[in-house]
């Protein structure tokens, strides 16, 4: 089956309305992109939990809609414009998209990732690259965290170099469960992963089972306020600052805290947020991101 892709350039305040209208009128999928992407005018657009986004769309947005080969995109675009009260119909571009083996195509884009001296993240369709490797079998797409992002790599490298076998571990904001799983594979004792997203909790349980690892994963309200030898949180700077008191309380006296998801320019303010409970210093940085660590007195 072939598909038809329709691309419409719209104003910032019209992007969401166009997306909804095209969906209502039969589009199989709709995405919104920066119309100036890959040009000097490209506009970074991102937010962070705990902060209201300053802007919800790009100044010039490109709405990309996908239709089946039996649809008439011209009729749909005209109907959407009429529904939105837009006249004349804005210009748009059409192109044919051939059907492919999308699973095979996606798999071809992911290779095993070497994270540390011995740690490898390996998709299920690949074999372990080294016989003595610490292998995490993990497929992309289940939840955030596959080892490809610098913050995940930094945390995994810290665990490889600093984890003491038998230590209890809390992975707060576990995502795919990757840090909890690698901690167990490196010899950690009781390990708990917490995430506010039920899908992440399910993905973590699935990944732990696939990797033959015993670890508990749950939503925050389902876990006791126990303290741990090691607490790891790879989130973002603003949530980390908001949770400073809570995360610090989860670290037992003499235990250690490891934080990432923090840009180099944010490290000082994150460390300041935790200063009432424990000192944090930069352990390592990569591609503008840092890993902070410290020991609770």
From Swiss-Prot:
Keyword Transferase: yes
GO molecular function, one term: protein-lysine N-methyltransferase activity
Reaction(s) the record says it catalyses: L-lysyl-[protein] + 3 S-adenosyl-L-methionine = N(6),N(6),N(6)-trimethyl-L-lysyl-[protein] + 3 S-adenosyl-L-homocysteine + 3 H(+)
Transmembrane segments: none
GO cellular component, one term: cytosol
Subcellular location: Cytoplasm
Gene3D superfamilies in the record: Vaccinia Virus protein VP39 (3.40.50.150)
Keyword Methyltransferase (UniProt): yes
Function of the protein: Methylates ribosomal protein L11.
Name of the protein: Ribosomal protein L11 methyltransferase
Organism: Cupriavidus taiwanensis (strain DSM 17343 / BCRC 17206 / CCUG 44338 / CIP 107171 / LMG 19424 / R1)
